[in-house]
Each structure stands twice: as C-alpha cells, then as structure tokens.
Amino acid sequence: MIFEFDKAKTIIKCLLLTAVCILGASGCGRKNNIEQDTSGVAEIVVSTVERSGEESETEVESDEFTVESRIVDIIGSPVFGDYGRLIFPVDFEIDDSMELKDISSILPWYSEINPQKAVEIVNYMKDAASGGEQIFYDIYSDEEKKADSSKNDTGLFFFRGEEGAKSAIVNAGGGFVYVAGIHDSFPHALELSKKGYNAFALIYRPGAQTACEDLARAIAFLYENADELKIDMNDYSLWGGSAGARMAAWLGSYGTSAFGEKEYPRPAAVIMQYTGLSQITGNEQPTYACVGTGDGIASYRSMERYISAIRDNGTNAKIEVFTGLSHGFGLGEGTVAEGWLDNAAEFWEENMEQNK
C-alpha cells in the first residue's frame, strides 16, 4: 500500500530534525496519528480578534513586515489570533532571533527561496485579516481536535479570488516531515487568487496517511461550506509540490472515500511539482507536472515516464522540464521556470468539464 512510504519517512524525520538542531531550529515533536476519524465536517466558525481602545488600534495599524521582521513576532501578531503559528513549520522550534531573511534555514530540501516573497505573503495575510477578512478556517471540529490533539495543527488558509470563482487547493511539500507552506503553497495560492481563483493552502499533519486524511477532510469541508465561502467547487483543482504532489495525485486517483470521508467529485486537474511518484493506478485525473533536470530527489526522467503512462491510459497529461533547476523551486521566479504556474492554470482551464 502507498502508505508504507511513512516508514521510511520516520527515519528521515529523525535525521532531519537532528540537522535542523545544528542549524538553530530543533524538532517540536508533533505526533502523527494514522487512525481515521470519519465524524462530520467542521462548521465554519468566524474567528475574530478582539480590538478595543488605543492598544488594539496600534496593533492593527502597525508597520508592514520586512525581511528583518522576527518570525516569532509574525507568529505572535494579534491580528493572526492563535493560527499565526501555522504560517511557519510547526514541527520545528524557531529561534527567537530568526528573521524572515533567514527562512531558508527552516525549509530543508527547497531551493530558490525568496525572502521578499515571504514578506509579500505575510503582509497580504496581515492586511486581509486586519481588514476584517477571515483568512484561516479549521477543518476539524473542536470535539475532533480534543479527541486528537494533532488535528490542532491543521486548517486552510484562504486566498480570496472573485466571488463564485473556481477553487484550488494547494499542498506544500516537506517530505511528510513538515509543511513548507511559506514557500511551497502560500505563494502559489496568492498567485492563483490574483488570477481570480479562490485558492486554499492546506496545513496538514505530516505522514502520508494523515496528510491524505486531512486533504480529504479539506475537500469535504469546502464542498459543505461552498455557499458560505462564496466559492465554486465544480471543476476544482489539486496542486502540490514534492510530498504535496503525492497527496494531490493520491486524492485524484483514489478519491475522498478512501480516506474516511464520503465520496466527493474528483478534481478537474492535478498539478504536480517535483515528485518521485511512479505508481500508476489507471484512475489518474488530467495531470500537469513540472520538474528541474538538476533535481536530486525527484528524477525528471521518472516524472516523464509517469506522465507518459498517464497519457498511454488515454488521460490528458503534460510535463515541463526545466534545465538545471534543483528540487523545490516553488514559483521559480527569476529562473527558467518562471511562468509555469500560468501554464498549469491554462491546463486546468482546458480540463474543466464546462470546456470539454
């Protein structure tokens, strides 16, 4: 079964956390729980940050974040309430002195990390939240989180597009050891929202099984709350990089019912970056992939074979291979990969049911 992948990841996690300690960030010890929970979808609960008097006005009107901003100050910003900690990897303890410009030290396996993009992301979140928008949604109920505390470290960050527009769910990688949202899903979601789409970045529990359960729950949550969120889940897409690409592919192939939820429609398209996934089920959805030739983790030749096999089964699939790029290049801004997201969005649009 695909989730034997977790066994190897347990070993990798131990090694990685040791390495991060040397770099100045040590492991937090968030535990994975692979038992399924099939109880109901969490209802939308509007999170508000109480503001009163001059102190609150000062907090809301504080200066924009910069590359010199300390990560702990961003996490603790009152405008983010108690979900600020989920903006950065919760599986690493972050040194109090670490600034945004040093963010690469808590993003192992990634390349082309741009602190200025991280600044844009956190300021976008701050401005939206201080303007009264709800930017974070729990996918599990309080009862579910009480029964399984690991579910406290899950949820969806909402990057709003146009009201009633199509929806995308973006899943960051991190080797199923941590969630690299600040580099591998938030930037993608922000760019998709600029195109008018409603984009959600999932924070999930590391571990292949729990990650897929959380993605299945996220899909269920969005379907159940589409009217309140003012989104269109018809022809939604699943995006992901590295481990997140595996999640997107597995949900696309197996569906939500395989991971403890009722059966919901499968995505119109799966968008994958730099993953070594090679297993073909025959149930793949239309798939776009991109990878660099310099990737020492996800072989571009393996990805080419994967996409070719999907096409051989009669399903639309496309791959872009970028010369010289390493693993985890994200948006690839300023590289030969810049613009891949535009191509991926076009692929998604081409495979929407309304366009068939």
Predicted regions located by residue number:
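Short beta-strand/loop motif that positions the catalytic acidic residue
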Residues: 289-291, 295
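Short beta-strand element of the alpha/beta-hydrolase
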Residues: 165-174
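Catalytic nucleophile-loop/oxyanion-hole region of alpha/beta-hydrolase
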Residues: 180-182, 200-229, 334-337
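Short amphipathic alpha-helix adjacent to the substrate-entry channel of hydrolases
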Residues: 181-200
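Conserved alpha/beta-hydrolase "acid-adjacent" motif
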Residues: 296-302
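Primarily recognizes the serine-hydrolase "nucleophile elbow" in alpha/beta-hydrolase
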Residues: 213, 217-284
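N-terminal targeting or regulatory segments adjacent to alpha/beta-hydrolase or S9 domains
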Residues: 2-4, 10-16, 22, 27-153
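C-terminal catalytic histidine-bearing segment of alpha/beta-hydrolase fold enzymes
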Residues: 53, 59-84, 313-356
